[in-house]
């Protein structure tokens, strides 16, 4: 049995600055950028967070929930553990690739696989979940988001400076002055401009989205089973309560407030208790996960 496809649309709002590293130029680690065609036809570089970043965060939340239900801590082969938490990798196997009834059983027993997919067991497993890119509300994306932003992508980011010392002492990292600025070309491509008076030793700079930046994004769960929908609703609820996005999470970056609306609304009753259902067949699930090695 499958349920209708559900799509969530809405916004993420930065409650702490967002880091999403791309390349490093000089002492500045830049945000990831894409070319966006403007209404007038010109191409402009705009910082955008990849959908893979958001999907990876949701996947890790899901893995933690499934681990709690199945109790597989320390009982999985590395390839299976990597497939559940990181998506796995496609490699040659000495046995028959995972397919047919064995693959169907794995998806049935482990909703993490059904929702997020994985690579393992000599095959790529498609997941039901698709995740959109996380697009900032800036002038250059108004025709995409419909947000009516007034801030340009050229001024929508900031440079945060840090020292390369460890965090064992009481260093005042946030008081460190940036050693470079960003200068933007006509197409929005950033170039670092070192400050000649600033000492470069033991310092580096990170370009971030500032607190308060609003982003548009979407999620789509394609024809899930009732168990997969129940599981993903739990994943989304857990993520929403303590949402993080991007890198440098351990030092305070990446906290976001989530505001996503589903269409159609998931059923209020009738969904299975995915934890109890999954835990009841834990031994079968662990056997099935062995097929990912």
Where are these regions (language model features)?
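RNA-binding basic/glycine-rich loop and surface signature characteristic of RAMP-family CRISPR effectors
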Residues: 1-293
């Amino acid at each position: 049995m499958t349920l209708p496809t559900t799509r969530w649309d809405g916004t993420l709002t930065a409650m702490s600055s967002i880091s999403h590293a791309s390349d490093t130029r000089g002492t500045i680690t830049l945000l990831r950028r894409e070319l966006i065609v403007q209404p007038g036809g010109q191409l402009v570089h705009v910082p955008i967070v990849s959908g893979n970043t958001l999907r990876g965060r949701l996947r890790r939340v899901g893995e933690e929930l499934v681990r709690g239900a199945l109790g597989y801590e320390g009982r999985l082969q590395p390839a299976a553990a990597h497939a559940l938490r990181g998506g796995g990798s496609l490699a040659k196997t000495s046995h028959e690739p995972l397919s047919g009834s064995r693959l169907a059983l794995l998806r049935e027993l482990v909703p993490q696989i059904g929702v997020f997919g994985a690579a393992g067991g000599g095959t790529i497993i498609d997941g039901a979940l698709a995740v959109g890119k996380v697009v900032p509300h800036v002038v250059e994306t108004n025709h995409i988001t419909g947000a009516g932003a007034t801030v340009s992508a050229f001024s929508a980011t900031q440079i945060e400076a840090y020292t390369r010392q460890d965090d064992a002492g009481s260093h005042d990292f946030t008081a460190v002055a940036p050693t470079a600025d960003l200068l933007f070309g006509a197409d929005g491509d950033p170039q670092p401009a070192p400050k000649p008076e600033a000492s470069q030793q033991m310092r580096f700079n990170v370009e971030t989205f500032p607190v308060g930046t609003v982003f548009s994004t979407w999620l789509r769960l394609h024809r899930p089973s009732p168990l997969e929908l129940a599981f993903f609703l739990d994943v989304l609820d857990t993520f929403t309560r303590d949402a993080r996005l991007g890198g440098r999470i351990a030092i305070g970056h990446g906290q976001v407030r989530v505001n996503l609306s589903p269409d159609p609304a998931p059923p209020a009753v009738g969904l299975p208790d995915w934890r109890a259902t999954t835990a009841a067949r834990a031994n079968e699930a662990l056997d099935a996960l062995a097929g990912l090695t």
